[in-house]
Design a protein with these regions (language model features):
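Mobile active-site "lid"/loop adjacent to the S-adenosyl-L-methionine
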Residues: 16-33, 162
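Short "lid" loop at the C-terminus of a central beta-strand within the Rossmann-like core
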Residues: 18-19, 54-57, 75-77
Length: 289
C-alpha cells in the first residue's frame, strides 16, 4: 500500500483475516500499520468498512475507537456452526464496522468535512416546502432554507441489518467470500460513480467485481498468489462481459436508429406528381380570387 498516492482512495472495503481458524489464509494482520496506511491514502469524506465477527469485531473497533462510527449487520441466508450446535446457537450474521476520520452531520454545516453517505433504496412519499420550520430529515443532510420551494421527502431509510445470500456454485471461489451484491450495496452507499475503492485483502476479487458493476475504479491487493490469479481472472472476465454488453447495447441503439430512419416517408414519382397537382389547384384558386 505504500506505493498508493496520498488522498487517492475514496473507500476501503476489506475482509481482513479474523484469525479464528488454524489455516494459512486466516493469520492475524497487525492493525496499527494498516491504519497508518489507510488514513494516509483516504481522500476527503471517505470511509473504511471492515468485515468482522466476534471477538475480532471488537478488536477492530478498539483499534481505532475514535473514528469508529457504527456497525452494519449482514444477515446470511444460511447459518454456520453446526459442529457446536448442541452447545451454542447457530450463527447467521457477520458485522461490518464503519470508520471514518470525517464526522457525520449536515452538509450545510460540515461541507467537505462530512463523511459521505448515500442511503440506498429510498422512496419518495410526499412533497414539502423548504419554508417549513422543520430543518432536518432531508436526504442530503442539509438544513432546509426558507425559500418557498417544494422538495421531495423520503421514506424507507436503510436499517442496520442487511440481508444478502451468499454466492454459491461456480461463483463461490473462496472460503470466506462475501456476496457481490452486498459489496455493491456498500460501495454505492459510501462512494459516488467513478470513485476509487481499495481492498487490500481481496481474496477472490468480489470487491473488484462489485466495483466494475457499479462504475467504480478498483485497487486490489492479495498476498496469496493462487487467489490473486483467481481474482485477476474473475475481474478480467467480468470486465470483458461488461464491454461486450456495452457493445451490444450500442449496436441495438444504432439498429433502432436505422429502423427509424427507414420508416421515414419516401417521396415516389407518383407522390411528387400528386403534390404538383395540389399546388396547381391552389394556384388556380389564387387566380380566381
Amino acid at each position: 500500500m505504500k506505493s498508493i498516492p496520498d488522498n487517492s482512495i475514496d473507500m476501503v472495503l476489506c475482509d481482513l483475516p479474523y484469525g479464528t481458524i488454524n489455516c494459512s489464509w486466516d493469520s492475524k494482520i497487525p492493525l496499527e500499520p494498516l491504519w497508518e496506511q489507510w488514513l494516509r491514502v483516504l481522500s476527503p469524506q471517505s470511509s473504511v468498512l471492515l468485515f468482522g465477527s466476534e471477538p475480532f469485531s471488537t478488536r477492530l473497533r478498539m483499534s481505532n475507537l475514535s473514528q469508529f462510527k457504527y456497525d452494519w449487520i449482514w444477515h446470511k441466508n444460511s447459518p454456520t456452526g453446526f459442529v457446536h450446535a448442541k452447545n451454542k446457537p447457530l450463527k447467521d450474521f457477520e458485522v461490518i464496522s464503519v470508520f471514518s476520520p470525517y464526522p457525520m452531520g449536515h452538509a450545510s454545516l460540515l461541507g467537505d468535512r462530512r463523511m459521505r453517505y448515500n442511503p440506498q433504496g429510498l422512496e419518495v412519499y410526499g412533497k414539502m416546502s423548504k419554508s417549513s420550520k422543520s430543518k432536518f430529515g432531508n436526504i442530503d443532510g442539509k438544513r432546509k432554507s426558507h425559500k418557498a420551494e417544494v422538495v421531495s421527502d423520503f421514506t424507507n431509510y436503510p436499517r442496520m441489518v442487511l440481508s444478502f445470500g451468499k454466492d454459491t456454485g461456480k461463483n463461490n471461489l473462496h472460503p470466506t467470500q462475501k456476496p457481490v451484491a452486498l459489496c455493491e450495496y456498500l460501495i454505492k452507499t459510501y462512494t459516488d460513480n467513478g470513485m476509487t475503492v481499495l481492498d487490500n485483502c481481496m481474496g477472490s476479487g468480489s470487491t473488484g467485481v462489485a466495483c466494475l458493476n457499479t462504475g467504480r475504479k478498483f485497487i486490489g491487493i492479495e498476498k496469496d498468489e493462487q487467489y490473486f490469479e483467481v481474482a485477476k481472472e474473475r475481474i478480467e472476465s467480468v470486465q470483458k462481459d461488461l464491454e461486450m454488453q456495452k457493445h451490444e447495447q450500442q449496436e441495438e441503439q444504432e439498429q433502432t436508429q436505422n429502423d427509424y430512419d427507414e420508416q421515414e416517408v419516401e417521396f415516389t414519382d407518383e407522390t411528387i406528381d400528386a403534390i404538383g397537382e395540389i399546388d396547381a389547384m391552389f394556384d388556380q384558386h389564387d387566380d380566381v380570387d
